[in-house]
């Protein structure tokens, strides 16, 4: 059975909102907050559980929105910054999707029999969920502990 887990970035695994002057920088088309953001969880522990999930058949990816107010050039810069962050902090991921702000996240990925989204936004989680196929993990909780539940620990 094909399975996948997707992570949101901003506010879920990357502390964008903790970067000084993040909003001003984004509004002036400065992508550096996406690189400067610190991880929101212990990335070694996240890598440990994700690698076990990968060995168990899961695809691990990121689905992240681009800036709300943007231009094509800024979208490219943000995408590159987010990829750089992901490669540094989450080198185990198999997929990366940077999509326009507000696009439903389930519309951009391949269908799997079991699909999880780890996200801090309740509305995004509600839009993702279905009774059988698509489930969510609230990133406001301990995401590493929640992922261990999928492993069976």
Name every feature range the model reports, one short phrase each:
Residues 82-98:
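Structural recognition of alpha->loop->beta junctions
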Residues 64-68, 94-105, 141:
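Acidic carboxylate-rich catalytic motifs and surrounding loops in phosphoryl-/glycosyl-chemistry enzymes
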Residues 1-2, 57, 93, 112-114:
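A general structural motif
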Residues 97-128:
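Conserved Lys-Pro-Asp/Glu-containing loop-to-beta segment of HAD-superfamily phosphomonoesterases
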Residues 4-85:
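Alpha-helical substrate-recognition element adjacent to the catalytic core
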């Amino acid at each position: 059975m094909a399975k996948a887990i997707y992570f949101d970035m901003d506010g879920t695994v990357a502390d964008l909102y903790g970067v000084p002057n993040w909003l001003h920088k984004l509004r002036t088309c400065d992508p550096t907050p996406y690189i400067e953001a610190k991880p929101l969880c212990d990335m070694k522990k996240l890598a440990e559980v994700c690698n076990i999930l990968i060995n168990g058949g899961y695809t691990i990816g990121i689905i992240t929105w681009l800036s709300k107010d943007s231009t094509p050039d800024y979208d490219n810069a943000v995408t590159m910054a987010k990829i750089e962050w992901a490669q540094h902090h989450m080198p185990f991921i198999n997929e990366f999707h940077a999509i326009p702000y507000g696009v439903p996240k389930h519309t951009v990925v391949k269908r799997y029999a079991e699909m999880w989204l780890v996200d801090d936004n309740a509305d995004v989680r509600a839009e993702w969920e279905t009774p059988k196929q698509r489930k969510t993990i609230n990133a406001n909780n301990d995401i590493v502990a929640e992922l261990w539940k999928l492993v069976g620990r």
